[in-house]
UniProtKB/Swiss-Prot annotation:
Entry keyword annotation includes Transit peptide: no
Locations listed in the record: Membrane
Biased composition (Acidic residues): 257-266
Transmembrane regions: 3-23
Keyword Hydrolase: no
Renumbered residue ranges of the record's region Disordered: 171-296
Gene Ontology CC: membrane
Compositionally biased residues, Basic and acidic residues: 282-296
Protein name: Uncharacterized protein MPN_491
Length: 474
């Protein structure tokens, strides 16, 4: 079985070190070359290279029951094998279900089963994300796993303090744009069965009486059908209640590549969505329906400081609000338009401010920020703006599309890596030396950031995740 490693060429930041920016190219790495890869990464360790990654793992872990289901579908094994294949020193996993507790340790045990002699996995599980404006379905955790043989976590992890801010500056002035509405499960509508009347004398009556009987029959059948729908929904809700409370607010993916890159949100298997689908009466969460004037981050970034062979570095991992404006939650269209909602636009616009706070908290300028931003293809510059203090190590181009589409291939470059300018040169330092060990297999060198091509995985990619992992070397 072949795996594909998708890499981005060249240094990031034109003129920073006198090199240009290249584009992604696919390279194939067979399992037979694994021993050669192990040698290469052992050499990397000796040369003090550090490999940091991020991955939206798609509603991962959760309760013991949820973990068992994922394990039976090779999800946990696939994620564990890929993480070990990529030889991360540190990797942050997003969309970790809120009920995750003991299953985090079980997953790390599985990671260690696949580990080489130079790797011993440890982990830090964040608390559940907190927000004054996000829905219950958006809550999740971040799981940071790291190789304790190569790095050491210093102190405790930290959530960005997440202040509420006025959203009016980020909202559209009313110009037309597409909104995002949760997709509802199709319910088959059976035509009412008309009751046949007998031809006996006693059954003969006026046309009015016949019409009344048919009307009553239709009404009865409709009530029965409604009851069947409600019963099925309640059964589904009861059966999946454990999973329902686990799952987070999954963002949508482009349904037609090359169209307008407009995403439709995937159905959330939460109690709230189930009730909507069943059209039953429920008390709606005020956070979902209120007309928002202030917002905070739906899922504030979680960060931690590590001692490495290259010095101390702060890594921060995040997951922005779902793409588009969800009218069910009172969300607004972003001022920038282009299919973005005001909430994720607000998060993009305040990312550099959040990074400032994280640096200040740890008193460390060396920061790597990695997140599933839900900022669509072509929108990076308008969404984030420019900064004199920070640089993107990922680019807004075809090569960096990391979110899998529903039909084929990748749809959007949602997953971003940002670093402080003071740390940028350290990221680029010796990156070429590291990649020299792959010349025989990848036929190129000089890479410092990369994207793993999950679409080439041997099983259905979305069985594992709807995102590919990204990473950077320093």
């Amino acid at each position: 079985m072949k795996l594909t490693l998708w890499l981005v060429l060249g240094a990031v930041g034109v003129g920073a070190v006198g090199t240009g920016v290249g584009f992604g190219t696919k390279y194939f790495l067979d399992h037979k070359a694994k021993s050669n890869v192990d040698v290469a990464f052992k050499q990397r360790s000796l040369r003090k290279q550090v490999n940091v990654g991020f991955w939206n793992a798609l509603n991962f872990l959760g309760s013991e029951r949820s973990f068992g289901n994922q394990n039976s579908k090779v999800k946990t094994k696939g994620i564990a094998e890929i993480i070990n294949l990529l030889k991360y020193d540190i990797v942050g996993l997003a969309e970790i279900q809120p009920s995750t507790e003991s299953t985090a340790e079980r997953f790390v045990d599985q990671l260690n089963e696949y580990a080489d002699p130079y790797t011993s996995w440890s982990y830090d599980l964040s608390p559940v994300t907190t927000s004054k404006t996000a829905s219950e379905g958006q809550k999740e955790r971040i799981l940071i796993v790291y190789n304790s043989q190569s790095v050491k976590m210093e102190g405790q992890g930290w959530f960005y303090d997440n202040p509420e801010m006025d959203i009016s500056n980020y909202v559209s002035d009313g110009s037309s744009s597409k909104t995002r509405t949760p997709k509802k499960t199709k319910t088959s509508k059976k035509k009412p069965i008309k009751k046949k009347s007998s031809k006996s004398k006693s059954s003969k009556g006026s046309k009015k009486q016949k019409t009344t009987n048919e009307s009553e029959s239709e009404t009865l059948e409709l009530k029965l059908e409604q009851r069947r729908v409600t019963t099925r929904s309640q059964s589904k809700q009861q059966k999946g209640q454990e999973q329902a409370t686990d799952q987070t607010d999954s963002e949508g993916v482009t349904t037609e590549e090359g169209a307008d890159n407009t995403d439709t949100e995937l159905v959330e298997t939460t109690a709230e969505t189930t009730e909507q689908e069943a059209t039953t009466k429920s008390t709606k969460d005020t956070k979902e329906t209120k007309d928002r004037t202030k917002v905070d981050w739906s899922r504030p970034p979680y960060s931690a400081e590590f001692s490495t062979q290259k010095g101390k570095v702060v890594v921060a991992f995040g997951h922005f609000d779902s793409p588009g404006a969800n009218t069910k939650r009172g969300e607004k269209i972003a001022k920038m338009g282009k299919g973005q909602g005001a909430h994720e636009y607000f998060e993009a616009q305040t990312t550099f401010k959040a990074m400032d706070s994280i640096k200040q908290h740890f008193n460390n300028e060396n920061i790597l920020f990695m997140a599933d931003t839900n900022i669509k293809f072509g929108n990076q510059a308008a969404a984030f703006g420019e900064s004199k203090d920070y640089t993107f190590l990922t680019e807004d181009n075809e090569a960096w599309k990391s979110s899998l589409g529903t039909k084929s291939g990748y749809a959007n470059p949602y997953d971003k890596i940002i670093t402080s300018n003071s740390f940028k040169n350290k990221v680029l330092d010796q990156a070429e030396t590291y990649w020299n060990y792959f010349d025989r297999y990848l036929k190129t060198k000089g890479h410092n950031s990369y994207l793993f091509d999950l679409a080439s995985w041997g099983t259905k990619p979305r069985t594992i995740s709807d995102h590919a992992p990204v990473g950077v070397l320093f």
